[in-house]
Amino acid sequence: MNLYFWILRLAAWFGHRKAKKLVAGQAMAIAAMQEWRATTMGAPVLWIHAASVGEFEQARPIIERLHQELPFRKILLTFFSPSGYELRKDYPLVDKVAYLPFATKRNAKRLLEILPIQTAVMVKYEFWPAYLKALEDKGVATYLISAIFRPGQLFFLPWGKGYLKLLHTFKRIFVQDQASAQLLMKHGVSQVEVAGDTRFDHVVEVRKQAKDLPIVEGFVAGAERVIVAGST
C-alpha cells in the first residue's frame, strides 16, 4: 500500500495533473481535519467515505436521510479522487468535505485521535486496511454499502486470507445482489444483507420531482422508441 502512495507522489513530481491534485489535497487533509474539529463543539462525527463521483451517488440517499433524521451529528464526507472532491467540495448536506488522508497506520491513528468518529460508512470497494483496523480498535461501528463481490477478488484467493479478515471489521455489509451475499457467507462472512444499489433510491426521488421539459417532449414527439446514451 505504501508503494502505491509513493508511485502517486512520483507521478505528481513528474507533472501528472490528477496525481498532483491528489497529493496536494491529501497533504493538507489532516490539517483540514484539525481546523474543522475546532468548530464541531465535540459533536459526534458520522464519517462517509466514497472513492469518487459514482460512489458518492451511491452514498447520496443515505446522506440525505441522515441529514434529515440526525441533525445533531456532524457529517464528514471524504474522497480519494480529485474528481469527486472537486465536484462535491461544496455539497450542502454535509458539514465537511475533505480528501482521505493517505491510508497509512499513522494517518489512520491521527484521524481517529482528532475526530470523535462514532460511525463510519464505506462505499462499494473502499477497503483500506489501515483505516478499517484503526476503526475496529477504536470500537467504531463501520458499515459497507452498495458492495459487489465476485469469486476472483483478492479476498477469496488462497493468498488473500488477510484481506478476507478485513471484512469481519464491518458491523454490517450491504450488498447489491444475492450472489455477493452467498459468496460472502460461503467464506464465513455472515453479517451481510442484500440491499440493492442505493443509486436507484436517488433516481426514484429525482423522477418524483421531475419537471416537464418542452424541448425534450418536442424532440420525442411521435417517436416509437428513443435511445438515450451517456458517457459514450
Where are the regions a protein language model picked out?
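Active-site and donor-binding regions of nucleotide-sugar-utilizing enzymes
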Residues: 9, 13, 17-209
